Each structure stands twice: as structure tokens, then as C-alpha cells.
Design a protein with these regions (language model features):
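PLP-dependent class I/II
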Residues: 1-170
Length: 170
């Protein structure tokens, strides 16, 4: 849940959102930051030197898109269907599914498939199988390797089905 739902946190939190994932337009790399005025004033002091601007067509397109809330409100069911499709397909592989909720990533345990590290497995998977995954160890400062990788299911169904077909052959 968002920190904005908790009064004690909302008054001192930055809420960061990505249009790309939220509105299923991955790759657009446009987002928002919401926070109390005092916090955003400080945030803008730093942000102005990190990011110059977002191109105008993206801003206009997103502003127009956001005027109709229906597509946004349909996204939970949209992503649930994709998660179910991908998880059901992964269940037919040797990869062990790990519980996921509230995300567009499916984590899997690879220990039953390989002795490679997460990172080496992901590199091998792209080169030899043609499927991309991210090693969870990439998110740890010490590279902690749990033999867990994540797949993004915020993709076209055809892409997911092609990936599943390849993963079944592992």
C-alpha cells in the first residue's frame, strides 16, 4: 500500500509513480513525485539538476490519457490476467514460482534448474534461450545470491507465450 494512506507517513513521504508501468506504456520513462509542499520544494532543488525535461508529446499524451480514468481503473484486472497467464505457464516449467502480489514481476527459484549464479543464469538465459530475467542479487549491495530471478509480465501476450514456450524446454 502507498505511504499516502497513512497520515503519519504521508506528511513525510515522497510518493514516486511511473506512468510506464502504471498505465502499461513501459519504456516511456515518465513519472511523478507527490509529497507535501515543503518536501517537494526541496526535491525540486535537487531534481532540476538531474533531469532537464520530458519531451512535450509525452506530456501532452499522458495528460490527455489521464482525463479518462477507465483504462487506469481496469489495470488491476488487466495485470492479474497477465500474471495468471504467466504463472500458469511457468508452473509447467522446472522453475519454482514464488508468491507475488501487487507487482508486475514474477519471481522464481532457479536452484532446481541450474548451479549457475543468478547473474550468470540470466546472462545465459538471454544468450542461449532468448528470454530476459533480472537477478535479485542485482538489488543487494553485497550481491547476495538466493538463486532467485524475476520476470516482468507487463508484456504483450504473444511475448509472454513465446517466453513460456522457451522456458518449458529448460
Amino acid at each position: 500500500e502507498s505511504a499516502a494512506r497513512f497520515p503519519g507517513l504521508a506528511s513525510r513521504a515522497f510518493i514516486v509513480s511511473c506512468f510506464g508501468k502504471t498505465y502499461h506504456v513501459t519504456g516511456w520513462k515518465v513519472g511523478t513525485v507527490s509529497a507535501p509542499a515543503a518536501l517537494t520544494a526541496e526535491f525540486r532543488k535537487v531534481h532540476q539538476f538531474n533531469v532537464f525535461t520530458v519531451n512535450t508529446p509525452m506530456q501532452v499524451g499522458l495528460a490527455t490519457y489521464m482525463q479518462n480514468p477507465a483504462p487506469y481503473l481496469e489495470l488491476p484486472a488487466f495485470y492479474q490476467r497477465k500474471r495468471d497467464l504467466f504463472a500458469q505457464g511457468l508452473a509447467q516449467t522446472r522453475l519454482k514460482l514464488l508468491p507475488t502480489t501487487g507487482t508486475y514481476f514474477q519471481c522464481v527459484d532457479i536452484s532446481g534448474v541450474t548451479t549457475l549464479s543468478e547473474s550468470d543464469f540470466c546472462q545465459w538465459l538471454v544468450r542461449e534461450v532468448g528470454v530476459a530475467a533480472i537477478p535479485l542479487s542485482a538489488f543487494y549491495g553485497d550481491g547476495f545470491d538466493q538463486k532467485v530471478v524475476r520476470f516482468c509480465f507487463a508484456k504483450q501476450d504473444a511475448t509472454l507465450l513465446a517466453a513460456l514456450e522457451r522456458l518449458r524446454k529448460l
